[in-house]
Amino acid sequence: MKHLNKLVRAWGRILAGSYPTLSLEITRECPLRCPGCYAYELEHLKEAGPLRSLADYQGQELVDRVLALVRRLRPVFVSIVGGEPLVRFRELDVLLPQLSRMGINVQLVTSAVRALPASWSAIPGLTLVVSIDGLQPEHDRRRAPATYERILKNIHGHRLNVHCTVTRQMILKEGS
């Protein structure tokens, strides 16, 4: 029943003019250089207008601009992506609790190359999503440098979702 009430409230907000989802690229920086990552394609957000400019800000200015955009568009759900969003760890440590207090459900998509703060587990409405490219051999072949073991260490103790890009090589692999 709790989930149904939440769904009804979300639909009410959408019908009243709120955006269902807002995806924010808060940085293009990333310590990895994974093949196929859109973050390094110069034109990947050419049509997005003001959203692309968020990646140009840091510190309190980034926090203020994200909050202003969220207040203006009133989304039900915010997805925070990058590059690697954890590059802006300090800003996220301020931003995530504020978005939660505003009643915004947030999805943070990360490679988990940095340890996830334990305190984030207590933030209501926050879903951590970790990008993994298959099991260890496949993942480490695609990532530069190999990160599978590091991810396991960095996500330990967290409840999260996994985002996996399925490639042609995975599908065609013998025994799949």
Regions picked out by a protein language model, each given a short descriptive name:
Residues 44, 85-87, 112-117, 129-145, ...:
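Conserved radical SAM core fold
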Residues 59-63, 92, 148-151, 173-175:
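Aromatic/hydrophobic pocket-lining residues that form the small-molecule binding cavity
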Residues 154-174:
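Conserved strand-turn element in the central/C-terminal portion of the radical SAM core barrel
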